[in-house]
Amino acid sequence: MASVALEDVAVNFTREEWALLGPCQKNLYKDVMQETIRNLDCVGMKWKDQNIEDQYRYPRKNLRCRMLERFVESKDGTQCGETSSQIQDSIVTKNTLPGVGPYESRMSGEVIMGHSSLNCYIRVGAGHKPYEYHECGEKPDTHKQRGKAFSYHNSLQTHERLHTGKKPYNCKECGKSFSSLGNLQRHMAVQRGDGPYKCKLCGKAFFWPSLLHMHERTHTGEKPYECKQCSKAFSFYSSYLRHERTHTGEKLYECKQCSKAFPDYSSCLRHERTHTGKKPYTCKQCGKAFSASTSLRRHETTHTDEKPYACQQCGKAFHHLGSFQRHMVMHTRDGPHKCKICGKGFDCPSSLKSHERTHTGEKLYECKQCGKALSHSSSFRRHMTMHTGDGPHKCKICGKAFVYPSVFQRHEKTHTAEKPYKCKQCGKAYRISSSLRRHETTHTGEKPYKCKCGKAFIDFYSFQNHKTTHAGEKPYECKECGKAFSCFQYLSQHRRTHTGEKPYECNTCKKAFSHFGNLKVHERIHSGEKPYECKECGKAFSWLTCFLRHERIHMREKPYECQQCGKAFTHSRFLQGHEKTHTGENPYECKECGKAFASLSSLHRHKKTHWKKTHTGENPYGCKECGKAFASLSSLHRHKKTH
C-alpha cells in the first residue's frame, strides 16, 4: 500500500561536500541516482523527473544522509513489508567511493555511510518507527494524531519541541531562535541572500519556491487561509491555527508565575519576560534592549533610511508592512467586500461587518459597570481596563497598568529623560517614534488626512476626532458636571480638572500639568522653541492650535458658527465660550473667592491675577526689556507692544 519514494533513499551532500567531489565522482553519483530511479520505476514507485545535479547543488538539509518520513502510493499496490524485504536482501558490502562507507544498496545504488546509517536505511524501507511521542496520544482532544511515531530519535526530539516550545538554535546576527538546525540554516541563508529563488520586489533570496511564494504574500496581501467561523483571512497557515484558538478558547501554555494561559508558546514566553524583565534582543547601534525580536527589527529601521514598503500611487514609503497596508486602505478602499451604504471596499467579510456598525450604530458590547456600549470587542476590552486597572503591564514608578506592552513602554518613557528618536533636520528628540513622525510633518507641511470640509490633518487619530464635530456625537459624559465629549481621551483629560490630578511634572521648574501635551508645550517656554511658522507673515508659534488660529486670520476662515445668533469663530473653544453667554452657565468656580467663570481658561487667568497677586504678590511674567513684572501672560504681551 505504501512504499519508498526517491527522496526516502537519496544521499544528500552539503554545498561544501559537493564542491569537493571531482568530475568522475560527480558522474558516478549521477549514474547511481539514475539507476536508483530506474529500479524504483521497475517496482512501480511514483517519482518526479528532476535535474539531479541542480537538486543536490542546493541541498534541502545539510545532513550527510537524510531519510524523509514521507511515503507515496505504489502503482501496483505493493505492500510496504514486501518492499522492505527486497531492500534488506539487496544490501551488499562494496567499497565504491573511497572513504565514504562500505555499504551500498544494489536495488537503489545508494551509498550508505556506515552501520548506523544502514540501520536507518532499513528502518525507512520497512516503515519501522521505534520512537513514539506519547504526549500526542495522551491528549486526544488537543492533537489529531495519537502517539505519533518517528524513524529517528532526532526527528522525535524536533517534534517534541512543538509541544515544549524549546528553540535551542539562535541566529548570531539577529538573535532569532529556532526549534531545529535546518530552520536556522534556512534563516541564515535568507540573511546572507543565498538561494536560487529571488523575490522580484525586495531581492530576498530563498532555497525553495514554496518559501518564496509564502514571502510574496507579504507584498501582494494574499490571504488564502480563511476562518470558517468569522471569515477572517490569513497569509500563513500558522497564523490561521493561532487564530482558531481564539474561538475554541484553547490555551496550552501557562505562565509559571501568574498562571495566565496563552494559545501559543511564543506569546507565553513574551509574557514571562514582563515578570523577569529579560530583554535578550539588543540593538547593535544604540544598545537598546528588547523583549521580542520583532520589536528589535522594528527599532532597527529607525536608525536606517530603509523603507522597503513603497506606495505606488503616492510614492510614500514605510518601514513596516502593517503601516503600509493601513496606508493603502486610505487610497483604494477597493476590497472585494463592498459596503452597500457608502461603497467602501474591504479585504474580508469581518472587516465589512465591523464597518457596517458605523452606519447602523449597532453596539454589541456593553460595559456592566458604567453602561457604555461599544461596537467592537477590542474597544470594549480597552474600555474595561479603565475600570479595573488590571492590565498585565504595570509601571513600577506610578503603578499604572496597561493592556499592551507597546503602550506600557511609551508610558515608561514619560518618567525618564530618554529621547531616542531624533529629527534629522533640526535635531529635536522625542520619546516615541510617532511623535517624531508628527514633528517631521511640520518641516514638510504634509497633511495626508483630508476631511470633506477641506480641513486636513497630520495624523489619522486627529482626523477621526475632527469627523465627530460634524456628526455632533458626544457619547462620553462627565458625571461631575455633565459636559459631553466626542472621545474618551478628552473625557479623561477633563476629569482631571475636577480631581486636580497633575501627573506630568516639568524637570526644569517642577511645575505640574494634568495633560502630557501641556507639559510638552510648557517646556518650549524654557527652550524658546517655536516650531510652527506662518508662511504668510513669518510669525512663529509654540502651539499648533495657536498657529492654526493665526492661519485663519489670513484666510478669514471662521468654521464654527453659533446656532443661536449666527456669530462665527475661528476656533471651537471660542464658540463654546460664546455659547455660555446665551445660557449664563459658569461651571468653573474659584475656590479662593467663589467667583465663577464660563471657561476654564478664564478661571486660570483669574487665579493668576487674583489669587497669586492678592495672596502672594507674585508676578511671574517679567519683561526682558525693562524688567517690569506682570501677573498674567496677556498683560505682559500688551505691555510689550509699548516697547
From Swiss-Prot:
GO BP terms: regulation of transcription by RNA polymerase II
Give the UniProt subcellular location, in the record's own words.
Nucleus
Is Glycosyltransferase one of the keywords? no
> Which SUPFAM superfamilies does the record cross-reference, listed alphabetically?
beta-beta-alpha zinc fingers (SSF57667), KRAB domain (Kruppel-associated box) (SSF109640)
The record ties this protein, via SMART domains, to: KRAB, ZnF_C2H2
Question: Molecular function (GO) terms listed?
Answer: DNA-binding transcription factor activity, RNA polymerase II-specific; RNA polymerase II transcription regulatory region sequence-specific DNA binding; zinc ion binding
Instruction: State where the C2H2-type zinc fingers lie.
Output: 134-163, 169-191, 197-219, 225-247, 253-275, 281-303, 309-331, 337-359, 365-387, 393-415, 421-443, 449-470, 476-498, 504-526, 532-554, 560-582, 588-615, 621-643
Q: Which GO terms describe its cellular component?
A: nucleus
Q: Which UniProt keywords apply?
A: DNA-binding, Metal-binding, Nucleus, Repeat, Transcription, Transcription regulation, Zinc, Zinc-finger
Q: What's this chain's function? A: May be involved in transcriptional regulation.
UniProt record similarity statement: Belongs to the krueppel C2H2-type zinc-finger protein family.
Record's protein name: Zinc finger protein 799
